[in-house]
C-alpha cells in the first residue's frame, strides 16, 4: 500500500514527543511490512486541510491520522466522505476509538500493528450530516464540557482536574429540558436531563465506548430530569461501568433518531465527539451509516477484513 501519515503535533502526547524520532519509527514499521509511506507533522490548525488534501489524492491507498480524540473524529469524517481507508494513532486523553478497535494505546506500539493490520468496514454516525465516530450528546455532558472550557488547562492532568471541577458544577446545577423524538418511527415527548446517541451501543466500561463498531445501529440513551442526588447516582453508576444498566437510563436501538426541541427559547449546545457545538435550528437528524467507514485495524481484530 501507499500510505500517508499525518500527525497533529499539538495533539495530546505528541506535544511532548520527539516527532522526528517518532516519524522514523513509523517509517521503519511500514516499510518493514512492505508499504510505501509519506509522513507529515503539522499543527492543529493545518490538520483538516492536510487530511482533505491527502484524501483527495488518487495515488494513496490509505491514510493514518495521529492526535487526540478531536483529531481522530475529524479524520474519520474526512475519510468517510472520500472513502479513504483510515488508520489511527491514539495520542489523546481518552482515545475512545482506539479502545473500540482494540488498538494499543502506546503511540510507539501502534504503528507496527497498523502496518501489519487489515481493513474493515466500520460504521459511522452523523448529526445533520456532520460525522461522529463516538457520540452525540446533550444535557449533562454538554453542560460539563461548557463548564470545563471555562477553566484554563495546559496538560492532561490539568484537563482531568478541569473535568472534575466541571462535573461537580453540573451535579449542583443539572439541566432539564423537553424533547420530542422519532426513533425508527417510535415517537415520544420527554423531559430529560441528558441525551446520548452513540455510534453503536456503549459497552460496559467506565469510559463508555462501543465495544464493536460494526453492528449497524445507534445507541439512544436518555435520563429523566435529575436532582443533584440523581446526577450523583448516575455518575456513580458510570464509574462502576453500569451506565446502561442504571435505573436512571432508558436505552433504545435505532437506525435513525430525529430530535426536536419544542421550547427552544435560548441557546442550546450539543457535544459531538467531545466538541461543543451550538444547535441553531431546534431539530437534529441523527443517522448511522453501516459499513461506510473503512478502518485499518490490527490483524487479530475479530471483525472480517482484508489483510493490507
Question: In which residue ranges do the predicted regions lie?
Answer:
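Catalytic core of DAGKc-family lipid kinases
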Residues: 4-6, 15, 24-25, 33, ...
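N-terminal glycine-rich "phosphate-gripper" loop used for MgATP/nucleotide binding
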Residues: 65-70
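Short, high-confidence coil segments that cap the C-terminus of an alpha-helix
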Residues: 59-60, 119, 254
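A generic structural signal for short beta-strands and their flanking turns/coil linkers
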Residues: 175-177, 191-193, 214-219, 253-255
